[in-house]
Every structure is written in C-alpha cells, then in structure tokens.
UniProtKB/Swiss-Prot annotation:
Bias (Low complexity): 29-38
Biased composition, class Polar residues, residue ranges: 18-28, 56-65
UniProt keyword annotations, A-Z: Biological rhythms, Cytoplasm, Nucleus, Phosphoprotein, Repeat
The record's account of how the chain is modified after translation: Phosphorylated with a circadian rhythmicity, probably by the double-time protein (dbt). Phosphorylation could be implicated in the stability of per monomer and in the formation of heterodimer per-tim.
Highest taxon, organism lineage: Eukaryota
Name recorded for this polypeptide: Period circadian protein
GO BP term, pick one: rhythmic process
Location in the cell: Nucleus; Cytoplasm, Perinuclear region
Amino acid sequence: EGSGGSGSSGNFTTGSNVRMSSVTNTSNAGTGTSAGDNSAGGNGSGNSNSAPAVTVTLTESLLNK
C-alpha cells in the first residue's frame, strides 16, 4: 500500500506511525487514538497525553510543508 501511492498514502503512513508511537507512550490504546484525533481532549484527559500531542503537532507542521 505504501509503495502504491507515493503522495497521499505516504502522508497517511507517516501519520499512522506517529499515532502508534504516541499510543505506546501513553500506554492506553483507547485514549491514545481518541487523543490523537482531538488534541484538546488529549490535553484535558491527562498530562501524559499532552507530551505526545506536542509531537503530533510538530509532525503535522512538517507534513504541511
């Protein structure tokens, strides 16, 4: 799938990788995925989620470039 589409699929694969790493850091799969979709919810749920939320924003800015 990754090789199939170098453009859009490439962005999705990187995004999924970031979300997976954030989930491992939070050690909560359920909250990790929901926090990834809603950054505000992640910050409100707990301090541990605020750290990966920052990394997600940084990766998103790089993807936008």
